[in-house]
Amino acid sequence: MNDNREQLTQQIIDAGRFLYGRGWSPATSSNYSARLDEQRALLTVSGKHKGQLGFDDVLATDLAGNSLEPGKKPSAETLLHTQLYAWNPAIGAVLHTHSVNATVLSRLVRGDRLVLQDYELQKAFAGVTTHEGQVEVPIFDNDQDIARLASRVQPWLEAHPYCPGYLIRGHGLYTWGARMSDALRQVEAFEFLFECELKVLSLSR
């Protein structure tokens, strides 16, 4: 294992422990990845507890989502990760989480997007410099056909190049960043804002 791969793998392992510890990636849910180079990514293997990841629980894939390591099976949602790396060369890490807040809020919001506005913490997202604008978070219906789901995500990405993440209804959050630390920051910001939105909804009823 070369030094770069070892470092990126450790970042994935550490992210899993942090996200599991916060309750945002329970049991074997969720998947994480990091860009290895222009043609490859490192992803968590399928069905592993994210708070107990080891070096053998991460594998390399190409950007079409194919495993490059015989005997290791990538997550079923690998294509949603590699799609992002192919779309934007600046992305270095992708995190998919299954928090209660993201799951519930995605079911409560009517329509195809959540609009965040007037929150100071919006500035935690890459490219956002003021609370006064809107951050649109698209919500895609869950689909076991990942290629079909990816085909619905792609047009949104192309039309919204500064999109910080998206939700899958009843499922969870996808967000990303130039580095793993950036992706983790965005997960944390999203979770704070999702909790705020849920409290606003509950108090307005």
Swiss-Prot record:
Zn(2+) binds at H96, H98. It is an enzyme of class 4 (lyase). The keyword rRNA-binding does not apply. One of its GO terms (cellular component) is cytoplasm. SUPFAM superfamilies: AraD/HMP-PK domain-like. It comes from the Bacteria. Keywords: Amino-acid biosynthesis, Lyase, Metal-binding, Methionine biosynthesis, Zinc. Binds 1 zinc ion per subunit. Its cofactor is Zn(2+). Pathway: Amino-acid biosynthesis; L-methionine biosynthesis via salvage pathway; L-methionine from S-methyl-5-thio-alpha-D-ribose 1-phosphate: step 2/6. The keyword Repressor does not apply. GO terms for molecular function: methylthioribulose 1-phosphate dehydratase activity; zinc ion binding. Gene3D superfamilies: Class II aldolase/adducin N-terminal domain. Its EC number is 4.2.1.109. One of its GO terms (biological process) is monosaccharide metabolic process. Pfam families: Aldolase_II. Catalyzes the dehydration of methylthioribulose-1-phosphate (MTRu-1-P) into 2,3-diketo-5-methylthiopentyl-1-phosphate (DK-MTP-1-P). Belongs to the aldolase class II family. MtnB subfamily. This is Methylthioribulose-1-phosphate dehydratase. It comes from Pseudomonas aeruginosa (strain UCBPP-PA14).
